Regions:
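Small-residue-enriched, tightly packed secondary-structure blocks
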Residues: 28-231
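Sec/Tat signal peptide C-region and signal peptidase I cleavage site
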Residues: 23-27
């Protein structure tokens, strides 16, 4: 019994040693690099019309979040971490300047390896937007999420998809075949926001247009959303 316990502890320690470097290697992308990568992900997904997010979904969306290169690593216990941006639809129908965010989550069960996943979240209701403005949002708890339809229109969406408040899109490379997002927490990255917009700037102020001298890579993210919405 003692030997079995010792063996299990050794396995868990090995797994932890493998997991932590993988999670930490991508933990602190500079904000402007993050913005550039988010634009790349958005462009890559939207440039294939038959596999893109339907433009009618983008037109009706309340917010869109892009998390490039989210890392998922696992060995018995698993974890995921990513950093990205989120913009919300303003009252006049245009897209706001983005706030910086993080996404984290965990899982238990047999798993081994590391994968990198690009994630896009399309918020269909105001409820999820209000939660993230207040600082934190959990997929599956604060709003239901489902894999979103792809193609030229959203007409092919299933009943389950139509009931979801958030559509998720992912592109995964590595050892994992997909990504499960329920239970993942989105949080405002106040440090990154301060680095770009200045100290003390709230997400609400960013979304309502109360910032100036926004760096070009951050503006480019907003402009790409405008472009793909108007197609």
């Amino acid at each position: 019994m003692f030997k079995s316990s010792l063996r299990l502890r050794r396995v868990l320690l090995i797994g932890l040693a493998l997991l932590l470097p993988a999670m930490g290697a991508h933990a602190e992308d500079p904000p402007l690099v993050r913005a550039t990568n988010a634009v790349r992900v958005l462009n890559d997904i939207m440039q294939a019309p038959d596999k893109a997010i339907p433009t009618d979904l983008l037109r009706d969306a309340r917010a869109i979040a892009v998390i490039p290169d989210m890392i998922k690593a696992g060995f018995i216990f698993g974890g995921r971490r990513g950093e990205g941006l989120i913009s919300v639809k303003t009252p006049d129908g245009t897209w706001s300047n983005p706030s910086f965010i993080t996404m984290t989550g965990g899982s238990v069960g047999f798993q081994a390896g590391v994968s990198s996943t690009d994630v896009i979240l399309v918020f269909r209701t105001q409820r999820g937007v209000d939660s993230i403005v207040n600082g934190k949002f959990t997929l599956g708890a604060d709003a239901s999420a489902a894999a979103g339809p792809v193609g030229r229109t959203a007409s092919a969406a299933t009943d389950g998809q139509l009931k979801a408040e958030i559509y998720s899109y992912s592109r995964t490379r590595g050892l994992f075949a997909g990504v499960a997002l329920d239970g993942s927490a989105l949080r405002i990255d106040y440090d990154a926001n301060a680095a770009i917009y200045g100290p003390g700037i709230t997400p609400r102020r960013i979304f309502e247009g109360g910032v100036s001298n926004v760096p070009a890579p951050v503006v480019d993210f907003r402009d790409r959303l405008e472009e793909y919405t108007q197609r």
